[in-house]
Amino acid sequence: MTQRDIEQLKELEAKDVLDHKEFARYEYLKKKLVNDARVEQFKKNQKEPYASKRSRAVNLAWEFFKDPQIDGQCYVAVGGLDSITLFLFLRSIGIDIPAVSVSSLEDKSIQKVHKALGVKALKPLKSKVEVIREFGFPVISKEIAGKIDTLNHPTEDNATVRHAIITGETGAQGGYRTGSRMQLPKKWLKLFGGADEEGTALGYQKAPVKVSDMCCYWLKELPCDLYHRETGRWPYMGLMASEGGRRQKALAINGCNYISENTRRSCPFATFLRDDLLRLALEMDAWYHDHWQEFRPIVKEREDGTVEYGDPIHLETIVPTIYGDIYQDEKGILQTRDAQRTGCSMCGFGIHREERPNRFDLLWERNPKEWEFWMHRICQDDNGEWYGWDRALDYIGVKWQKPWLYIEEKRNAEAVEQLSMFDQKSTTMSQLDDAVAV
């Protein structure tokens, strides 16, 4: 809270009677005071040593599992390396529960790991193409895409929200603020604000493509929600606040374990940084090789819900090849050599922040035909012309052409780095030989 907010809260608390607008502002400031304190404590937890975070994750996982409202009825929502690590981590501490995933959305190397670990495959409610054609491209961030989608679908009920997105001025629910974070950043307001009449009047543009945050709902969230309804199980999730976006504030305010009337979930890794997660992934990789025979792939699912398992498959590593190897950079921080984060091959959230080769460039390297489809063959405009991510990326100023040039540049840089490391090692060995000779 700002000093001005604190002073205003004191002024409102000193009043005997508050009018409607003052009361809304008072309620907002009280809530903000509590939430800000939670966020500060969460940030302190993020700065703790790895051992402390790991120990807390163990306690959080068991606390959720044993809660009377959960009573062991849990599952692990598995996707990329973060949640693969979570699944193995839970198993390593004695929490043996099912893992489920909409695996068809993931990279082939991730699907391979899912299969070997016995992860149950769920089906998306719509295909990736159907979601983009019906709702729009998932671009910039989930939060911003959701606001753009709201502007594109004006109703009387969302008029106040649309006004806040355009101007930053909120109503009663937002505490009658001005300049709030509800407003789209100026860069995106200029490009997308014209979807709303108020934005058009202010001179903002309307995008030539639809934008939406609905992809995750139809492809991942709804299938998992249906699994919960069928089984009564609640999820463990591998989310980390350090990844930013909506989850950062939600995890800080609601906590690692969240239990309410309609929502229950556990995120034991919420305070982890990327380095923490990769360190644990290496530990779980070692643990897996001692216990790999405990994991069997699902080879058949029967109509009654039971499954048939096959023989164990011994993975070379639990780290899917899309990530490359895990290495320590010059600052001593663990990194993955290739993909940093993964998801649907057509997802564009955060693409504007990536240097080339970006995720679409790397997709071209893995599968040129899939790249060609997502770039040029998803939708048709009113003139019958086909387009895809090419049009969306052009509009937001993200370069995508000639991915092979950037892939080659990256591989050359890696070769030079490996040669340099070899030379350094050879020099060190030579110096040791000289020392021994003396």
Show where each model-derived region lies.
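Low-complexity, intrinsically disordered short peptide segments enriched in small/polar/basic residues
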Residues: Q3, A14, D36, S55, ...
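Short, solvent-exposed coil/turn linker segments
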Residues: E13, S127-E130, P403, T428
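Secretory pathway export signals and precursors
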Residues: Q8, R25, V211, Q340-G343
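ATP/NTP-dependent adenylation/nucleotidyl-transfer catalytic domains that generate, transfer
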Residues: A37-Q41, K66, G72, N262, ...
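ATP-dependent adenylation/nucleotidyltransferase module used to activate substrates
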Residues: V17-K21, R25-D276, A281-E283
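Short amphipathic alpha-helical heptad-repeat segments
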Residues: T2-E13, L18-F23
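Intrinsic disorder/low-complexity segments
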Residues: K15, R25, V436-V438
